[in-house]
């Protein structure tokens, strides 16, 4: 799960589509049939038919139930959605969420579930910030973070009298890069693609071939 966060108009949707297309291309180079599904905010999975890359662009927290959000984000199991979506089986390889809210703020608004259950299922987050003085193509700053488990839980204030206890948080791994193409390449090559296409998926043994190893 990749979460892209930034203010309206900063280019979240464009970046989500660019990243999804590059993942699709890499899948096809690995002989994996790949396709992209962009979900609508009203009925996100009505037109979903097994695409392996899913873009959830500007969905609201209540676009899915808490249980359906968790099913979609589950990295280990195929997810049968609720009857609202006719029990569709959702089996994406990659989910790209684009939203103006931070993940912590977004998931805190989903009722009936601990926010940590959502945050720990996010692998990476890209945050986009507009420069105060933009210059041609280098008008944004891009950061990549990954989710880490905290050794000591921390409290996050989300309103005047409400706190969240966080067991997971985001750690920056690529900081303040204003070269979009360079940033995308590094993020994909070093962090996103290795998760999307684990080595065993494309190994000869995974394709039914045996390998004789000598030690």
Language model: regions and residue ranges:
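Hydrophobic positions on the alpha1 helix immediately C-terminal to the Walker A/P-loop
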Residues: 15
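Hydrophobic anchor at the beta1->P-loop junction of P-loop NTPases
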Residues: 4
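The conserved Walker
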Residues: 8
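Pre-Walker A adenine-sensing motif
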Residues: 1
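AAA+/P-loop NTPase substrate/partner-engagement loops
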Residues: 22-65
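Conserved lysine of the Walker
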Residues: 12
């Amino acid at each position: 799960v990749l979460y892209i966060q930034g203010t309206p108009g900063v280019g979240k949707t464009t970046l989500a589509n660019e990243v999804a297309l590059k993942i699709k291309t890499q899948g096809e180079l690995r002989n994996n049939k790949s396709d992209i599904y962009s979900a609508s905010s009203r009925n996100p999975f009505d037109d979903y038919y097994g695409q392996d890359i899913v873009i959830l662009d500007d969905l609201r927290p209540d676009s899915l139930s808490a249980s359906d959000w968790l099913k979609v984000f589950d990295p280990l199991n195929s997810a049968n959605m609720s009857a609202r979506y006719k029990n569709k089986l959702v089996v994406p390889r990659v989910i790209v969420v684009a939203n103006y809210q931070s993940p912590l703020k977004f998931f805190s608004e989903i009722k009936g579930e601990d926010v940590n259950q959502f945050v720990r299922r996010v692998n990476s987050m890209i945050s986009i910030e507009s420069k105060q003085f933009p210059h041609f193509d280098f008008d944004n700053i891009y950061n990549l973070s990954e989710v880490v488990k905290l050794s000591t839980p921390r409290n996050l204030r989300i309103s005047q009298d409400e706190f969240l206890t966080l067991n997971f948080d985001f750690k920056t791994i690529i900081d303040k890069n204003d070269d979009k193409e360079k940033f995308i390449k590094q993020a994909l090559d070093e962090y996103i693609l290795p998760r999307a296409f684990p080595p065993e998926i494309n190994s000869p043994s995974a394709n039914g071939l045996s390998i004789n190893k000598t030690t």
